Regions:
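Metallocofactor- and cofactor-centric catalytic cores in central/energy metabolism, strongly enriched
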Residues: 1-129, 133-143, 150-211
Length: 211
């Protein structure tokens, strides 16, 4: 059956090296538990939330940490990693953007491009390493019938030479600690979906396995 509507060809898309990009978040300005000074967090219900988490873990119950990318963009990755290492967090659940910022920190030591400038000059999201490596990892994961998070964590673990900053990567730490890290993807919403090597079937399969 012939396709009625023309499909866009991504093969001619031009990408840029992320090494040349200015990043708003770097491993040098990340916050560190017990080191970085901060104001006391005051929010109604926060103390109760903490108490419930502590109670849950004391009773052997899981704590599923559901988050978006701004946890990473606000330089808080090390706090999440510390909570995993302490045995507080037993499951990471996040969206695609979270995995991208986390992945970029691992290989580049920085993430969060200057969006207004990047949109203006047409470079937004067109980063070769991020798109190529993440899609490579995901497609490998699809062939192995493993989830999105495990596929990325295993890829980072297999290529230490590419990821000198992986100690600050949430998904890699989850992989090493044998904590599930699941990523729940909306197709077409992440920058790696516009990369020439993107395989939507592989992304859907791996994210579906995570679900």
């Amino acid at each position: 059956m012939l396709r009625r509507q023309m499909q866009l060809d991504f093969s001619g898309i031009k990408t840029y090296s992320a090494e040349d990009r200015h990043n708003l978040v770097t491993i040098d300005n990340m916050m560190t538990p017990g080191v970085t000074p901060h104001e006391e967090y005051k929010y109604e219900g926060f103390d109760e939330l903490v108490e419930r988490i502590v109670k849950a873990r004391k009773n052997g119950r899981p704590v599923i940490w559901s988050m978006g990318a701004h946890v990473v963009k606000n330089r808080l990755s090390r706090y999440v990693i510390e909570l995993m290492k302490m045995g507080v967090i037993t499951h990471i659940a996040a969206n695609g953007a979270t995995s991208i910022h986390d992945f970029e920190l691992a290989y580049l030591g920085g993430t969060s491009e200057d969006v207004p400038t990047a949109i203006e000059d047409g470079s937004f999201g067109m980063w070769e390493q991020t798109g190529a490596w993440m899609n490579e990892a995901i497609q490998r994961g699809a062939k192995l019938n493993i989830g999105y998070g495990e596929a990325l964590g295993e890829y980072i673990d297999m290529h230490p030479e590419k990821f000198p900053n992986r100690e600050d990567c949430i998904l890699w730490n989850a992989y090493k600690l044998d904590i599930p890290a699941t990523y729940h993807i909306a197709l077409g919403t992440d920058i790696i979906h516009q990369h020439p090597t993107c395989d939507m079937e592989a992304i859907g399969k791996c994210s579906g396995i995570d679900f």
